[in-house]
Amino acid sequence: NIKFEDILEYHAKYFIPNNVYIVVIGDVNYKEVKSLISEKFGVWKKGKTINDPEPILTENVALTEINFVDLPTATQSAIQVTNNVNLKMNDEDYFAALMANDILGGGGEGYLFKNLREDKGYTYGAYSSLGSNRYGVSKFRAGAKVRNMVTDSAVSEIVKEISRIRLERVDSELLKNAKAKYVGSFIRNAENPQTIAGYALNIKLNNLEDDYYESYLENINSVTEADVKRAANKYFKIANTRIVVVGKGSDVV
């Protein structure tokens, strides 16, 4: 039902100079860049102040719910265990939350992958993700695509691993490796001008301190095993989670 006029209206409302940031990174002179931007964008007229309501965090379910979508042609079941989270980049436990998610399901070394892929052989990969934004309105997700016949077992194992990181302190070596992964990635990415531009934009969009990325590595390395456990309990739900499964009902239910 979207018409071309709707796109034009959207563009006119949101693509305005009082709703954008221009980030320039490189071997440049500030005065010259400012002059050039004024020359190229000076005729760009301001629009009306945007007063759209900020998104509001939806409450998680009172008790865990299972939502099943029957897809008769499916050869696999897609599983998502999810809950809403209130997490911002400037929250005190943000870096602990990053480490908790990485240890749970950030890659091949995560709890989920080692259990569902390496141990059980249910899937080619099992991962988790933890979102954040300036409004504190995002999601935690853990999931995998598995054979239809092992769907129930896979759900149980995913919940088991979420419970594990909530109840048990993570091994110090696992935390050390998770930190090293983030530190290495940060250093490599910092060599890319586009990444630096993204950092500058993040500081503005997320109301971060100007030295946020200068202390990034220090904040990562200061996370303790106890911090990880606290973050996992805060952001990874068990009793208030939604389990969504899309698969072939005749094989699963």
Question: Can you annotate each of these PLM segments?
Answer:
Residues Y21-G26, E173-V253:
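C-terminal regions of mature proteins
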Residues G26-K31, R147-T151, K248-S250:
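Helix N-cap motif at beta-to-alpha junctions
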Residues A142-G143, S163-L167, Y213-Y216:
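Short beta-alpha connecting loops at secondary-structure transitions
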Residues K34-F41, A154-E161, V253:
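Short amphipathic alpha-helices in soluble, non-transmembrane regions
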Residues N1-N18, V43-D91, D102-D152, L174, ...:
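Non-catalytic beta-strand/loop surface segments
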Residues D93-F95:
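Zinc-dependent metallopeptidase catalytic helix centered on the HExxH motif
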